[in-house]
Amino acid sequence: MPTREELLEEERKLRRLRIIVDMTRNMILQQPINYEEAYELVKFVKREALQLFPGKEETFDIIYRPRFNRLLNEKFGYRLATNLHE
């Protein structure tokens, strides 16, 4: 069973990721950026997520990829590439 400190650290990392995702979403929606710039922002979010939660690429693809796909499709008419490469 995780310790209280481990649970607090997990919550801190989740909160940080939530902030990063929300800020990125707002930037894509509200800033005059093109698809390529938005795509780079999504790649940044994925890198940050994997830095916070190593080995959780599949989780990112299940939770956040569909959200960003909808967002990019709504704004630009494009979806994310199959793989978000560096």
Predicted stretch roles:
Residues 2-35:
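N-terminal acidic leader/helix
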Residues 36-40:
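Short, solvent-exposed positions on alpha-helices
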Residues 44, 49-86:
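Helix-rich interaction surfaces within compact, conserved domain-sized segments
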